């Protein structure tokens, strides 16, 4: 395969793999029961992101480009899951929203529901507060969350 095509194919393959990974995480009805389970789940996500990063670095060798971009998204989601202090959730989620401006309320709701330790009031407060703040997109940002559909049933249940 010629270099420009290989470069484009590798970048698209990485985007799709990460997209499907995030889709699986967001759509599964996983709910961690304890801080230990959250920690183990988040560490597994970080390990898998590192494996994907290594694979795509090998595939992208010689292109002179950063091949980590999309894999970092998995690690960022893992950080929200791993967080042990629920009072810091708002800060971590707001960092996620500023990094990934296409992330929607449904994604945040699914992520907080997955944690299993967030009250409905806290979820609603976080989502409402984040809706009020403007998000300034990085001009180089390639949207990934806009392609991830989250079952609306979860969000409706969360906010009631």
Regions found by a protein language model. Name each.
Residues 1-160:
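Extended alpha-helical "rod" scaffolds
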């Amino acid at each position: 395969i010629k270099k420009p095509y290989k470069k484009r194919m590798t970048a698209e393959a990485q985007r799709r793999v990460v997209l499907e990974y995030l889709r699986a995480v967001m759509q599964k009805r996983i709910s961690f029961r304890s801080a230990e389970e959250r920690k183990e789940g988040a560490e597994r996500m970080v390990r898998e992101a590192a494996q994907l990063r290594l694979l795509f670095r090998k595939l992208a060798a010689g292109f002179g480009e950063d091949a980590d971009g999309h894999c970092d998204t998995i690690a960022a989601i893992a950080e929200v899951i791993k967080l042990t202090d629920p009072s810091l959730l708002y800060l971590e989620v707001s960092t996620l929203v500023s990094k990934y401006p296409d992330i929607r309320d449904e994604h945040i709701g699914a992520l907080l529901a997955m944690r299993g330790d967030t009250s409905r009031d806290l979820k609603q407060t976080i989502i409402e507060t984040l809706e009020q703040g403007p998000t300034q997109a990085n001009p180089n940002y390639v949207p990934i969350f806009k392609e991830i559909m989250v079952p609306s049933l979860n969000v409706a249940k969360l906010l009631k």
